[in-house]
Amino acid sequence: MSELNTKTSPATNQAPGPEEKGKAGSAKKTEDEEEEIDIDLTAPETEKAALAIQGKFRRFQKRKKDPSS
């Protein structure tokens, strides 16, 4: 499964320039230290939260499509 990383800009996917080589090494270090969170997708709280998020997103899309309402 692919994950979207919203923390990095598209420019960071390119090869680093001479001044960015030090940054690339430290960025890799923080990614390795990141904690992986295991979410139970069958839990009732998770399903409830997902439905709430989906509902808000649908309302947002509807308002975005028809700003007069």
UniProtKB/Swiss-Prot annotation:
Record keywords: Phosphoprotein
InterPro entries in the record, alphabetically? Calmodulin_Regulator_PCP4-like
> Where does this protein have compositionally biased stretches of type Basic and acidic residues?
18-31
Listed name of the protein: Purkinje cell protein 4-like protein 1
IQ domain location: 46-69
Give start-end positions of Polar residues composition bias.
Answer: 1-15
List every stretch annotated Disordered. 1-47
Coiled coil located at which positions? none
PTM Phosphothreonine: list the residues.
T8
Give the family per the record: Belongs to the PCP4 family.
